[in-house]
Amino acid sequence: MEAPPVTMMPVTGGTINMMEYLLQGSVLDHSLESLIHRLRGLCDNMEPETFVDHEMVFLLKGQQASPFVLRARRSLDRAGAPWHLRYLGQPEMGDKNRHALVRNCVDIATSENLTDFLMEMGFRMDHEFVARGHLFRKGIMKIVVYKIFRILVPGNTDNTEALSLSYLVELSVVAPAGQDMVSDDMRNFAEQLKPLVHLEKIDPKRLM
């Protein structure tokens, strides 16, 4: 899920190599309210946002060993909101002492014909899902707590069922390359959420 709503970073000129710093965990349904209460106390003094997003994952298979993956996401509860196209690179295998997973991140707002464009480019949809949850902010950190729903009839986002009896929890920061000190702040924040949820540096390859 990578699945939560995405942030937009304005670029005034040139190219900025943005990186996503990420910690992940999960919490059972019956512990959700306790976690939300804790986050309200720790995060910025504003009401958390709620979201209902539809995400489609597209693959482009070529001669390379693994397909090229792009994610198209749209809001189901905010009429007129732009589609988002997101690319997430492979996790960096750098400093073992780095407290968060780090990967390249490209996120752009697009027009509503995004999926048609991707299909014309040769991409094929691999899977789709609906994500429902809450978004909190603490400075530059973003915390999302959300549940993933399976779409039972392709394309029909009204016909879904929960994928599990738990909520995913993600703590992330999007920053220019080289800002590794943010992972220290993330670790310190994650410590304050224990024992309700344990946020960890999880390598997606280990889940495959």
UniProtKB/Swiss-Prot annotation:
Taxonomic superkingdom:
Eukaryota
Identify the Gene3D superfamilies for this entry.
Hypothetical Protein Pfu-838710-001
Q: Where in the cell is it found?
A: Nucleus
Q: Which GO terms describe its molecular function?
A: transcription coregulator activity
According to the UniProt entry, which residues carry Phosphoserine?
66
Per the record, its GO cellular-component terms are: core mediator complex; mediator complex
GO BP terms in the entry: positive regulation of transcription initiation by RNA polymerase II
Keywords of this protein's UniProt record, alphabetized? Activator, Nucleus, Phosphoprotein, Transcription, Transcription regulation
InterPro entries linked: Mediator_Med18
Q: Which PANTHER family match?
A: MEDIATOR OF RNA POLYMERASE II TRANSCRIPTION SUBUNIT 18, MEDIATOR OF RNA POLYMERASE II TRANSCRIPTION, SUBUNIT 18
Q: How does it assemble?
A: Component of the Mediator complex, which is composed of MED1, MED4, MED6, MED7, MED8, MED9, MED10, MED11, MED12, MED13, MED13L, MED14, MED15, MED16, MED17, MED18, MED19, MED20, MED21, MED22, MED23, MED24, MED25, MED26, MED27, MED29, MED30, MED31, CCNC, CDK8 and CDC2L6/CDK11. The MED12, MED13, CCNC and CDK8 subunits form a distinct module termed the CDK8 module. Mediator containing the CDK8 module is less active than Mediator lacking this module in supporting transcriptional activation.
Describe the function of this protein.
Component of the Mediator complex, a coactivator involved in the regulated transcription of nearly all RNA polymerase II-dependent genes. Mediator functions as a bridge to convey information from gene-specific regulatory proteins to the basal RNA polymerase II transcription machinery. Mediator is recruited to promoters by direct interactions with regulatory proteins and serves as a scaffold for the assembly of a functional preinitiation complex with RNA polymerase II and the general transcription factors.
Can you tell me which family this protein belongs to? Belongs to the Mediator complex subunit 18 family.
List the protein's name.
Answer: Mediator of RNA polymerase II transcription subunit 18
- The source organism is Bos taurus
List the gene name.
MED18
